[in-house]
């Protein structure tokens, strides 16, 4: 058990991200209590306590909210409606706001919002059936990437479509609300994290992420790229 003298932060999710968050919070005097469906989750040993409960369990959320000063989440599988309801009921602030979670948990809504904001994204279609995928193939050509709109991570919820013969099997793999994207050829993948305070937004250094079979295996910091590219990423 770790106890700090400052505020207490509740984190929904206790995976590797939750562990790193708790480790970073301790030197700042921030206590961390986590909740996760898995007992002895990665963040549990470095947090003050862990509650065991599902990501859509209102009772677990309520108990967590009543024990902390602020709530956050480290995984997108949380039900934003439940989180919003518990926050209002207990007057415990949630950051980011549950409305933000509702936006980012759905890949299609996320892509639509980014496109509306003028951020470059791969060409995409909403998928309600096989014809939508075939229409995308006619417009974009193969290969395509079929993605589950919700719940995908670490390669789960993705299915590559290299030709017409892959379409049915890809739809069977996803088996739910989906979107399809044009395939993007790239040299490397860069990632950047932004942080928002009361009156300003700042960024951490740009990193390079290396994936194998769609699972992150290595992060290189600082990213191996030219200054102009790094500045474009920050902007």
Tell me the role of every PLM-derived stretch.
Residues 1-100, 104:
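ATP-binding N-terminal substructure of ATP-dependent carboxylate-amine bond-forming enzymes
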Residues 5, 120, 154, 186-190:
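Short, basic and Ser/Thr-rich N-terminal targeting/leader segments
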Residues 33, 72, 93-96, 122, ...:
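Structural detector of well-ordered beta-strand residues that form the stable sheet scaffold
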Residues 54-58, 80, 130, 164, ...:
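Structural motif corresponding to alpha-helix initiation and N-cap regions
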Residues 75-76, 148-149, 182-183, 196:
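Short secondary-structure boundary segments
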Residues 97-159, 164-165:
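A conserved helix-loop-beta module that forms one wall/lid of the active-site cleft
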Residues 157, 161-235:
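Internal nucleotide-binding/catalytic subdomain
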